[in-house]
């Protein structure tokens, strides 16, 4: 039943996108779209599981970043095609048997369409308001992460129980505080340095990365895992909150840099 609902949602998004924003034949858009698909698939294949403070369950992958840049660069129709192609080819190359779970296909669609719609509808006044909201959200996420770490003494990861000792908690607090500080310094530095057009691009990069991290990483993906494997929704939030505190600043820097380079090339 969930597959049918997800299929209807994906098809509805596609109908809306192609009806509201009819595609125009554009060789440059096609070429960029193909490059984004290739880059996303390569990064997906390079994803690795690494130990994080002794916990071997943190998946490091940057595959979402080319999709976000695609959303900020391409027309909505091309964004939809890029997301579907990336998900399909990724499954083919991974040699995954059976029918794919469409929840992750919906993730890919949102990872391109959310940035694209932000690009279309966001104006300067809304940018400044949303930037403040983003900062507040980041502080809240960081505080929740610290509070959660402070309250737990052990965590079940990959079927094994790990003790969260005081030195580990302190290290996590320092990492969260450091990444949040770096993010705010980075935002302030570029706000004072960039011209108006580049500042708009920078705001879009910030809002896109944070929006995707909150909707896909923090909400949808845990829900899909609960639906597929019965993993409790909050079981993985410990690692996801910590991962978001690190990956959001990194993602903003990479997305903005990639987007700025592409804009210079296509101008």
Task: For the regions a language model picked out, list residue spans one by one.
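Loop-helix junctions at membrane interfaces
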Residues: 1-267
């Amino acid at each position: 039943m969930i597959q049918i609902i997800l299929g209807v949602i994906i098809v509805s998004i596609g109908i809306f996108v192609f009806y509201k924003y009819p595609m125009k034949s554009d060789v440059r858009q096609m070429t960029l779209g193909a490059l984004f698909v290739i880059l996303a698939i390569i990064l997906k294949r390079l994803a690795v599981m690494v130990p994080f403070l002794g916990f071997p369950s943190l998946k490091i992958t940057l595959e979402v970043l080319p999709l976000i840049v695609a959303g900020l660069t391409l027309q909505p129709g091309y964004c939809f095609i890029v997301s579907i192609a990336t998900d399909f080819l990724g499954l083919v190359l991974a040699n995954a048997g059976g029918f794919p779970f469409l929840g992750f296909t919906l993730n890919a669609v949102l990872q391109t369409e959310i940035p694209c719609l932000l690009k279309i509808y966001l104006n300067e006044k809304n940018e400044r308001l949303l930037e403040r909201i983003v900062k507040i959200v980041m502080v809240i996420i960081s505080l929740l992460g610290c509070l959660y770490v402070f309250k737990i003494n052990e965590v079940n990861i990959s079927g094994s129980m790990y003790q969260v000792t005081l030195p580990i908690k302190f290290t996590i607090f320092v990492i969260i505080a450091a990444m949040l500080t770096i993010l705010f310094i980075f935002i302030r530095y570029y706000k004072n340095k960039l011209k108006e057009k580049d500042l708009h691009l920078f705001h879009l990069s910030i809002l896109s990365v944070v929006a995707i991290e909150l909707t896909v990483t923090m909400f949808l993906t845990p829900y899909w895992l609960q639906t597929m494997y019965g993993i409790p929704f909050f079981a993985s939030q410990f690692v996801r909150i910590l991962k978001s505190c690190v990956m959001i600043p990194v993602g903003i820097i990479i997305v903005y840099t990639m987007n700025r380079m592409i804009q210079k090339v296509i101008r």
